[in-house]
Amino acid sequence: MFSRQTIRKPDSSIIKDQIKTKIKMNLNIPIQDKIPKYKFNIRQYATQVNKDMAVILVYFNFVKSNRILQNLYTVKSLLDNAQIPYFITELAFSSDEFVFNPQPNIFQFKTDSYMFYKENLIFCAEKLIPESYDKICLMDADILFDNPEWYTVISQQLNEYNIVQPFKKAHWLQFDFSIQMLKENVVDELSSDVINYGLEHPGFAWAFTRNVFNDLDFFDKSIISSAGDAILTFKITSKMDRHTNDSVIKFYETQFKTKFKVNSTHEFSSCDLNIYHLYHGSLGNRQYVSIHDVVSNYLSRRNIKLIDMVERREDNLLEWKPKFKNDMNIMMLNYFTLRKDDE
């Protein structure tokens, strides 16, 4: 184990400048003339009787964004009122308090590492959810449906298909609930082998039968930014991510010395549902591409790979090894800060 003095602390101002430069990337978002002009109205969900599907939400908020927490409270309240079974995996930094009081459906972890923990927390949660739920729905904690019966629609579709991307159209909302952007799912149009980020969205929500989810060998190490959705899409549909010159799929294959495989034995589908993404800052500030480039440069200069920098705890949570924790924490905390989710 290295002492703290042996870790070379990178200049945080340089890292910030790198990220701010990369933020000007091409988001590949076309001008859309047919975006609906109405404002989204939140609707209560239908109370559920058949509860065979567990909804998984994750929450980590290292910079204490009010809007991210407010969005989670909105989603949680709707699920509570409809008695929809859900599980929240909450992660807090070691010096911070948890937001939620202990509950059977809230799994809580603490860490002293800054990572993009979404996929890792999903992986941790699935291991803890009772086996009585034979279906799961992975859902971002800022997603709403306009159909009160969405839970039943998804669950019934999972009776026919093992994998479901549970929407036809995804809408990005402004802070006033007007619609900023509109995209399709990635599973209905398979004529291309590339994810068309201008028209398609690989994220927000996926649903699975429980046994098939485990059979997919879910990759939970996309710890730099939200690349897990692209990796999952490739495993399901064989659609490649070419959002950047250096695909994030190739990035993680290289960094973790693995090869993602398409699971062609399971049928997949979508649902005739609309989903709506609650606002938390400008889309340009997400920096999904920029942070990968910054970290790639760091790794190249040191001739090291992520697989050598990460360790897994007994409870399945990933953390930086002590030797690299200082450097990576500086980079990742700067990334989370520069996202400006409360703007």
Stretches with model-predicted labels:
Residues 2-53, 61-75, 222-343:
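C-terminal catalytic/acceptor-binding lobe
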Residues 50-54, 76-89, 104-105, 134:
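Short loop->beta transition adjacent to catalytic acidic/histidine clusters or analogous donor-positioning motifs
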Residues 59-64, 78-82, 89-99, 143:
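A conserved acidic beta->alpha catalytic loop
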Residues 89, 164-169, 271, 278:
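Short glycine/serine/threonine-enriched helix-capping/active-site loop
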Residues 90-133:
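Active-site-proximal specificity loops/subdomain of glycosyltransferases
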Residues 98-101, 150-151, 175-180, 281-283, ...:
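Short aromatic-enriched loop/helix-cap "lid" or pocket-rim segments at secondary-structure transitions
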Residues 133-144:
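Short beta-strand-to-loop acidic/aromatic patch adjacent to the donor-nucleotide binding site
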Residues 145-238:
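Conserved catalytic core of nucleotide-sugar-dependent glycosyltransferases
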